[in-house]
Amino acid sequence: MSQKPAKEGPRLSKNQKYSEHFSIHCCPPFTFLNSKKEIVDRKYSICKSGCFYQKKEEDWICCACQKTRTSRRAKSPQRPKQQPAAPPAVVRAPAKPRSPPRSERQPRSPPRSERQPRSPPRSERQPRSPPRSERQPRPRPEVRPPPAKQRPPQKSKQQPRSSPLRGPGASRGGSPVKASRFW
């Protein structure tokens, strides 16, 4: 465990250094924005925020200072740079179509809650057939599966009974009379 923090330690320190550079003053290798809102890499420059470096170009604004300024109150030349942040709002729009599937899930959950009360009043279904018929459209998919499970065994019972009546030709797909003709 002690080895992991030792490895992550220097990485964190580098990140801290970068964050300090961004928050406190400009760093040589980082990008700067000029008055034309163009992002350019400048090794030595001073931005409007008062960062210190060799070249005195007040037109250049480093991205770090821009980020700090934007949180406070961005200047007019910096505000257009924020507008590209509007696309995330557009990205949120597709998230809205995702909500309708959730609305579909909600109707499904109430039928589940209805299943429990149905089991005790099954004996009452006969006298209350009219109100039950109104509720049946929803539980139809739920009611159909159990009878379907009961039907297959009935069919299996019928098949062995019918097979001796049909004879050996039935397995071939034809009647025993047709089978005798082929022979």
UniProtKB/Swiss-Prot annotation:
One of its GO terms (molecular function) is structural constituent of myelin sheath. Residues 68-183 are annotated as: Disordered. Residues 101-143 have a biased composition (Basic and acidic residues). GO terms for biological process: nervous system development. Sequence repeats lie at residues 97-106, 107-116, 117-126, 127-136. It is found in: Cytoplasm, Perinuclear region. The modification Phosphoserine is found at S99, S109. PANTHER family: MYELIN-ASSOCIATED OLIGODENDROCYTIC BASIC PROTEIN MOBP -RELATED, RAB EFFECTOR MYRIP. GO terms for cellular component: mitochondrion; perinuclear region of cytoplasm. The keyword Cytoplasm applies. Residues 69-78 have a biased composition (Basic residues). InterPro entries: FYVE_2 (IPR041282), Intracell_Transport_Effector (IPR051745). Keywords: Cytoplasm, Phosphoprotein, Repeat. Residues 79-96, 151-164 have a biased composition (Low complexity). Residues 97-136 are annotated as: 4 X 10 AA tandem repeats of P-R-S-P-P-R-S-E-R-Q. The gene is MOBP. The lineage of its organism: Eukaryota, Metazoa, Chordata, Craniata, Vertebrata. May play a role in compacting or stabilizing the myelin sheath, possibly by binding the negatively charged acidic phospholipids of the cytoplasmic membrane. Pfam families: FYVE_2. The keyword Transit peptide does not apply. This is Myelin-associated oligodendrocyte basic protein.
